[in-house]
Every structure is written in structure tokens, then in C-alpha cells.
A protein has these predicted regions:
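Short, surface-exposed "cap/lid" segments of acyl-processing enzymes
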Residues: 136-203, 215-217
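C-terminal catalytic histidine-bearing segment of alpha/beta-hydrolase fold enzymes
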Residues: 375-378, 393, 402-459
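Acidic catalytic loop of the alpha/beta-hydrolase fold
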Residues: 262, 295, 398-403, 432
């Protein structure tokens, strides 16, 4: 989640140029918190004293739960941890026959201009919400929802109207926290205002660009899962081209995302070559900042301190897609995971961070962040060696302690070594301030790509 911060405008801002060869940085010390060793005795005591929550059996035919390969107990737990329905069938209902629809194929469309326009502040011609086929993290059929915002007026620039893919940091566990919910239903307690703090949508619309905003956590609200997010974004681009072939079929697309939106953007560019190779000539670049590119770093920087609530929510979000993670929860964590907390937005689950609890308190195994399973998840979500087929602009706060800059620098090094034209900017600030200090240049860089200016390469 990005905090409240000041945006200084839509133009180039002074960034601190990174030298071509960045020295190997050390992981900065995390903020002060409770430094506890593994807690096997407390874990054992929790499971002895607290019974497991009573759970109804999972429906065998539920694609949301996908219980076929799970034990009955784990299937029941997974079913109980899924996000609550929000009373909007467009969002809640799993479409029939998804296996027969190609990724990016449209399954439903609705016009939400009447409710969306007041929330967008700037004038718009139309806002469409697309429901389309995508794949989950295991390449099984799923569905995605994306909102396409079309500006007023004709496009007067060269070629077709460009599209900005604005990957917001949704950072949430409930479906009503998605940007599509606010656009379809108006402002609510669940609305995420990050899109106004970093006003990419508004600036792009005033520029004459269309804007695509994806609910990139998927129907399971798999917060922090980059493969789900990457697939959802790539298939959203396919869906737009399928829905409006005459207006946007030959358009260029450019991506931008910060923090949780950078997780999604990173997933999209790293998976593009293998999942949607035809988009390599359609997407002209991606700008990403505050990049949680390596979760093994966050295991040190966000555990047992004020960020622990967000970190626990991210682990839980990944567990929704990877139930082997859910199987490592102790009884206390299971009670929390099946409670109303499992469908909340970030302003709720950040609060437990004041307790500065280590993740060990929720696990049923010692050293859960150094387990074989943890290292497997780190490797899968890091997507080592996958090359972006499009140019990259990467930035990170040099004083960052929640999401250490070493992760972004390593991503930059990796992509440079793979031959990707890339730029890295080390900007002033920790996570919240750096969102503002790095934003103007990243948006200017993306604008230049959409205008057809060749991407610089500072590798």
C-alpha cells in the first residue's frame, strides 16, 4: 500500500542517475521490531490449547476451490479462506465453459460510465468493464475483470490511440477493494485512493490516452501473487483488443505500477514472452517502482515489525493460490483466515502490525520463512531468468526499508544481463516518499514510449 504523499507533477523530475555498474548492495537492516527466534514451543502450545475451526466440506465442483488434488481437510480450509461474495454477479459468478474460451476471450461486458465518471474527476467518454478468460498460477482456467476508460475527443496523434495499463497497488483481500468495484458502485469504505495520490489515470486521459485498470489479484484475491497478476494483465490487453478491434486493435500499450502494482507489472513483463508472445510488439514498455521483486528480502524487512500485518496478508494471499501454504497455518491462524478479516482492504489488516508479531506465531512449523516451502515460493515468485521483451524503467527509494532497493537493483541487473533496454533510478525516500519522488520521471518515460520515442538503455 502506498501512503499519502505529494505528487509534484507530470514531467521529468530530478532523479539520481544510477551508474552503469551498481556495486553489490547489502540488505539494509529492517526497522526495529521484535527479534524472536523460531517459536516451536509456542506453536505447539497454540495448537494444543486452541482447537481448529469447524469447517464445512468444500464443494467438489467449485472451480474457485479446485479441491480435486487436496485432502478433504485442506479443501475445506481453502474454501473457507476464499473472499466473500460482494453481491455483484458480474464479479462473483464463475463463468460456465471457461475451458472452451481462449485466454483474453470476452465472457461478459458492462457499461459503468454513469457510476464511474464521477469517481474519475476528469471527463470521460465511456467506461467499460470486461470479464474475460485468464489462467491462474497453475495454468488452470480462471477469469479476470478489467475496466477500460475511454477519454473524450478523437485521438489526433500518430497511429491508433495509445493505452496506459495502470496497475494499481490493490493490496487487499476483499473483492470490493478492487478498482472495478468503485468504478461500478461509486465510492465506499473499500475504495482505494492510491489512484488519486499517483494520478496516472487522470493524467493519461487528459493526454488523450485510453486507460486499462485490471483487478489483477484475480477472483481468489491472491494478493502479492505475481503469476496470477501477470496473466490477468496480459489477458486484459488481449480482451481490449478483442472487444474494440477497430478503435484499439492496433494501439500501443504501456504499463506502470508501484509497490503492489509493481509486483503485477513485473509478473506481466516476465511472463509475456511465454504466455502472450504476440503482445511483445504491442506493449512498448513498463515502468515500475518500489519493486517487491524478491520476497526472500521481505521476509527480513517486513516480518516482526510494523509491516507484519501487510506481510502476513501477502503470505495469505499467495496461500489462496498455493494451498500448501495454508496447510502450514496453525489453529490460531486458521481462525483468523476464515474470519471476516479474510475479505478486508489494507487499512484493516495493516493495523495488527502495531503488535509487531513474527510470522512464526501463525505457523505450525519452526522457521517458516526459512523452510523448503518458503524457498520454493521465493524462487517461483522471483521468476528468475525470465526476460522482459519490452524496455523497463525501474526505480526504488534509496532510504527504503520495507522494500529494500537491493531487490529492484537485482532485477535491473538481471534484465540488463538478459539484453533488455533498461533504466534504473535511485530516488530519495523510503516507500511512501519514493512513490512521489520517482513518479514524475517514470510517467514521463512511459509517455515517451507511447509517443514512439526509442527507449534509452543505461545498462
Amino acid at each position: 500500500m502506498i501512503g499519502w504523499c505529494t505528487i509534484v507533477g507530470y514531467g521529468a523530475a530530478p532523479g539520481f542517475a544510477q551508474p552503469p555498474h551498481i556495486g553489490a548492495p547489502a540488505i539494509p537492516p529492517g526497522p526495529p521490531g521484535i527479534a524472536l527466534p523460531s517459536l516451536p514451543d509456542i506453536q505447539h502450545w497454540i495448537d494444543e490449547v486452541i482447537p481448529a475451526p469447524p469447517l464445512a466440506p468444500a464443494h467438489a465442483d467449485s472451480p474457485l476451490v479446485d479441491a480435486a488434488q487436496l485432502t478433504p481437510d485442506l479443501a475445506a480450509l481453502r474454501a473457507a479462506t476464499m473472499p466473500a461474495a460482494i453481491g455483484d454477479s458480474f464479479v462473483d459468478d464463475w463463468p460456465d465453459g471457461l475451458d472452451d474460451v481462449a485466454p483474453g476471450g470476452i465472457v461478459a461486458v458492462r457499461d459503468v460510465t454513469a457510476t464511474a465518471a464521477p469517481t474519475l474527476i476528469v471527463p470521460v467518454r465511456q467506461v467499460l468493464q470486461l470479464k474475460y478468460r485468464t489462467d491462474d498460477s497453475h495454468d488452470e482456467s480462471s477469469y479476470g475483470i478489467a475496466s477500460l476508460v475511454l477519454p473524450v475527443g478523437d485521438w489526433t496523434g500518430p497511429g491508433e490511440r495509445p493505452v496506459v495499463v495502470n496497475n494499481l497497488p490493490i493490496d487487499a483481500l476483499g473483492r470490493d477493494c478492487n478498482p472495478s468495484y468503485t468504478l461500478a458502485h461509486g465510492f465506499s469504505r473499500a475504495s482505494n485512493f492510491t489512484g488519486y495520490i499517483l494520478p496516472t489515470t487522470q493524467l493519461a486521459l487528459l493526454r488523450g490516452y485510453a486507460v486499462l485498470i485490471t483487478d489483477h489479484e484475480g477472483p481468489r484475491m491472491a494478493y502479492a501473487e505475481p503469476i496470477v497478476a501477470g496473466h490477468a494483465i496480459l489477458d486484459a490487453i488481449r480482451a481490449v483488443r478483442n472487444q474494440l478491434p477497430d478503435e484499439l486493435g492496433d494501439s500501443k500499450f504501456g504499463m506502470i505500477g508501484y509497490s503492489g502494482g509493481a509486483i503485477a507489472t513485473n509478473g506481466a513483463v516476465k511472463l509475456m514472452s511465454e504466455y502472450a508472445p504476440e503482445l511483445s510488439d504491442v506493449v512498448v514498455g513498463a515502468a515500475l517502482g518500489g519493486v517487491p521483486a524478491d520476497f526472500s528480502l521481505l521476509a527480513h524487512s517486513m516480518n516482526a515489525n510494523l509491516a507484519s500485518g501487510v506481510f502476513l496478508a501477502a503470505v495469505f494471499g499467495i496461500g489462496r493460490e498455493r494451498p500448501e501454504v495454508l496447510a502450514r497455518m496453525n489453529h490460531l491462524a486458521q481462525w483468523v483466515a476464515v474470519s471476516v478479516l479474510n475479505s478486508q482492504c489494507s487499512e484493516v489488516f495493516t493495523v495488527p502490525g502495531v503488535l509487531q508479531l513474527p510470522i512464526d506465531i501463525a505457523a505450525n512449523t519452526p522457521d517458516p520463512l526459512d523452510s523448503d516451502l518458503a524457498h520454493e515460493i521465493y524462487s517461483i515468485t522471483r521468476m528468475d531468468g525470465k526476460k522482459s521483451p519490452v524496455p523497463l524503467f525501474i526505480f526504488n527509494g534509496e532510504q527504503e526499508f520495507w522494500v529494500p532497493a537491493v531487490g529492484a537493483k537485482n532485477l535491473y541487473r538481471e534484465q540488463c544481463a538478459l539484453g533488455v533496454p533498461a533504466v534504473y533510478r535511485s530516488v530519495f525516500g523510503e516507500h511512501f516518499i519514493a512513490a512521489a519522488t520517482g513518479y514524475p520521471e517514470s510517467l514521463s518515460w512511459l509517455d515517451q514510449r507511447l509517443q514512439g520515442v526509442p527507449a534509452p538503455n543505461e545498462c
